[in-house]
Amino acid sequence: MRTLVTGANGLVGANLVRELLVHGHEVRAFVRQNSDLRSLKGLTAETVFGDVLQPDSLAGAAEGCELLFHAAAVFSYWKHTPDDLKKVAVQGTINAVQAAYRAGARRVVLTSSSVVLGSSARPQVRDEKSPFNETDAYSISKAAQEEAGFARAAQLGIELVAVCPGMCLGQHDYRLSPSNAILCSYLKDPWKQTWPGGCNLVSVRDVARGHLLAGQKGKPGQRYVLGSENLEWPAIHRMIAELLGTSEPKFTANHTSSYLAAAAQELIASLTRQPPLSTRAQAKMVGRYYWYSHARAADLGYKPRPARAALADAAAWLLSTPHIGMQLRASLTPSRDVYAAWEVLQAEEERLQSHANA
């Protein structure tokens, strides 16, 4: 099957391309001109350049495709205006649905986010029916994206299925997404802070498999949470410390101290022109529980691995990149789980490379 993936060089997109190739798809990878293509290096996917905000380029890329995965997005809490986020999310999705219609594709799988299901002040688990209650620009853009996508798909008779990943961790994240940055930030934090609240951690490899299942079995008009374990932040940080042989959390920051620290980080970032370790938008999430059930996706055959495996995958890959500097790397003592994860990642890449050379 010929399949189009937008945002193919991103964290989710690059892992999705690999999953599709393994399952015999003829993949067309849609990326912007001058994109960083390291995450697609050596793969047999056809690279097509364009922009989701340019309908003709997207329609041309979709020509001859039976299935479209729309993973293109701006996932950032820094240096993007609310209008920028919403424009790419909403208009880009409308254009993707219209491109599928023009190409005669039967289905679009939209990469949404679990944040469209809101969060809770207490440790309770939400699901696909939970109401949206977030106020940050990124979350608002994702909720608007879903609404616009489902509406346009209904008008054109396109089968649209939305998948809502939790906090994705893993490999091929060269631009460093906010999710993997959480791990790096803890390692770089000299005070080893943790904070109240929690989130749902999931391996991006499992999220990629969940996309494939949604494309095969998902019900049109439905959304599916692609998550794994729900954990509190102190437990997550202790797990990172254990996996990488560093200090466990030394104290718990509250909402106010987190917000002030993030404001200081943003000021430093504006002077150094380097992304901050945290932002005020992220600090507002302190104390909230982003916990979700993936029971509906389980009906499709979705079986994610534990959060520890997701963290081990991410740690193994990040240690091989400049995201973790040499000095910091030398201070760490990775566990056997991290080394084992690296061996698996290497074996998977070698298998893909062998397939490409066959």
Residue ranges of each PLM-predicted region?
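N-terminal Rossmann NAD(P)H-binding glycine-rich loop of SDR-like oxidoreductase domains
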Residues: 3-25
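NAD(P)H-binding glycine-rich loop region in Rossmannoid oxidoreductase-like domains
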Residues: 34-91, 99
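Conserved Rossmann-fold NAD(P)-dependent oxidoreductase catalytic core, especially the SDR/UDP-sugar
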Residues: 70, 74, 82-138
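A conserved pocket-lining segment of Rossmann-fold NAD(P)-dependent short-chain dehydrogenase/reductase
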Residues: 131, 181-202, 206, 210
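Glycine-rich "substrate-gating" loop/helix at the edge of Rossmann-like oxidoreductase active sites
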Residues: 135-137, 166-175, 192-205
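Active-site Tyr-X1-5-Lys
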Residues: 135-161
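Glycine/proline-rich active-site loop of Rossmann-fold NAD(P)-dependent oxidoreductases
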Residues: 156-158, 170-181, 214-224, 246-248
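Mid/C-terminal beta-alpha module of Rossmann-like enzyme folds, strongest
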Residues: 210-280, 299, 307-358
